[in-house]
Amino acid sequence: MRILHMNAGAEDGGGKTHIISLLDQFPTGEVELAVFEDGIVAKEARELGIKVHVFSQKSRYDLSILKNISEFINNEKFDIVHTHGPRANFYVSLMKKRITAKWVTTIHSDPFEDFTKQGLKGWIFTKLNLKALKNIDLFFVVTNRLKKSLAALGISNEKMHVIYNGIEYDKEKAEGYNKKEMFNIDEDVFTAIQVARLHPVKGHEVLFDALQRTKLEKIKVLLVGDGPLKENLKSLATEKGINNKVEFLGHRQDVKQLFASSHVNLLTSHSEGFPLVLLEAANQRVPSIVTRAGEIEPLIVDETYGWIVPTDDGRALALALEEAYDKWKTGELAAMGKHIYEHAIMNFSLQKLYEDTKETYKQLIAKNL
C-alpha cells in the first residue's frame, strides 16, 4: 500500500494536527506527503521522519506544477492520493484523468462555508471547490452533519465514510504557567482560552460581544492564533472597550501549557466539523464552551461535559461564561474537565482514527468500495 497525502502546506491548527498525527501512525514507506508550500506542515512532517515532496508554485494560481505532480504520482505507483483542503482538491480534479491512483479526501468543514465572508474571491473559490468534490472516489467526513452538505452536491452515501477525529492523550496534564509572571494575570482572574485562526469563520466578534456584555470583571481570554483579521480584531477590541479582557498571543508552540493554564476553553465559530481543539482542551482536563457550529454533541453529551450555545449569540455566550465562572469558584469546573477527558479518551482516539482509515484504504484498493 502506497498513499500520498496532499495539502497546500500552509495549514495550521486542527487541519495540520490531523494530517501530521495521522501520517505518523503509518509504517515507514506506506505514506508520503506532497505540499505546495514548504511551510509548517512540511517542517513538522520532516521532524517525524515522514517523507515530504515540495511542488513549489510562483503563486497559488500557478498550475505549471500539475504535469510534474501527475507524473510523480504515476511513476511512484501510489495506490491512493488523499487530499486535504480546497487547493489540493482543485489541483487533483484537474489531474484526475491523468493519474492511475484512486482519489480520497477528508472533509474537515462545511465546503459551502470554507470561504465565508471573503467576497467575490470567496464565491469563486467555493464554486471551484464544490465542482472538484464531484470527481472524488471516496470521502472521509469528520461528522454525520457534513454528509448532508455533500449529499446536497449529489454525492452518494456509499462514497462517504464518517470517521471522527482523534488524538493521543496524556496520562498527566501539562504543567501550567505562573500566569502572573508570564502574562501579568492574577490568580483570582478567571482565565479562558480560544485557540483558533484569526479568520472570519471563527467568530471572534461573537466572543468580543460576549465580553462586552458579561458582568464578569476579573476575566482574561488568551487568544492563540494568527490570521488575516489580526489588526481588525485588535481594533474591534479597542472599540468595544475590552482590551483589558483579551491577550493576543499569536501562533504558539506551547498550546498544551496554555490550556493547562486556563479554566475553560472557547470556540465561537460560525462553521465547524468536529473540532480537534476540543479534544486538545479535554486532554488537559479543560471543559469547553462552544457554538453549535458543528457536530459537537458526541463529545459534549450534556451539561456535565460543557456548554453548547447558539451561533452568533453573544448574550448566550456571556451567560455560559458566567456559569463557568460560578462553577470554577465551587470547584465543579475542574470536575467537568476530568469528566470530558475520560469521555474523550474512550471515544476519540488517534489509534481508532488510524485503524478506520487504513481499513478503508484497503477496501478501496481492493475495489470493494
What positions do the PLM features span?
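Aromatic "clamp/platform" in nucleotide-sugar-dependent glycosyltransferases that forms part
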Residues: H251, H270
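A short helix/loop element that forms part of the nucleotide-sugar donor recognition site in Leloir-type
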Residues: E172-I185, T330, G337
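Conserved acidic donor-binding segment of nucleotide-sugar-dependent glycosyltransferases
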Residues: D302-E303, W307-R315, A324-K329
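A conserved mid-protein helix/loop that constitutes part of the nucleotide-sugar donor-binding site
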Residues: G13-S21, F190-R213, P228-S235, L276, ...
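Nucleotide-sugar donor phosphate/pyrophosphate-binding loop at the beta->alpha transition
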Residues: L63-K67, K102, F112-A132
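A short, active-site helix/loop in glycosyltransferases that binds the activated sugar's phosphate group
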Residues: K134-K159, I167-K171
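Short hydrophobic beta-strand element within catalytic cores of glycosyltransferases
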Residues: A34, P287-V290, I300
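Short His-centered aromatic/hydrophobic patch
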Residues: T83-N89, I107
